[in-house]
Amino acid sequence: MKVFIDPPNSLILFDLVERFGHEPLSSMAAIQNKIDNVEVDMPPMNLTLEDVIKGLKYAGVEVPSGVRGRLSLWGPMIEEADAAIIMLDPPFNFGCVGCERSNEMVKYLIKRRGIPSISVNYPNNEEEAKATVGQIKEFLEGLK
């Protein structure tokens, strides 16, 4: 199954999803596809018209361009996902969590899709980390 991870560039969540036999949907792969695209002259600085249109599908024109840009990458992944893992309250250095508007929109899009999802709190010590990994493992095994 295809599992969207939030934050979308979390290597920890990416690895867990892969270890339990699922396909992680992450921003790393989406960005790689953009960089390999010959339409983009100076990756990753340029956007195509298609990117702008994709972003407008998920957020209106009055929404900051950074939010629309992120959603132009993440929105299609959420639409493709069969399930989702959401890390709650991570520190700013855990993936790309600096834009709260983007984060809220991602959670809304996942909820609106109605796909199976799990929200786990970011662990602050070893015990919590083990419990978090256990919750994610149980969720992923239940998807098979």
Write out the residue ranges for each language-model feature.
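An N-terminal assembly and electron-transfer interface module characteristic of large anaerobic redox
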Residues: 1-144
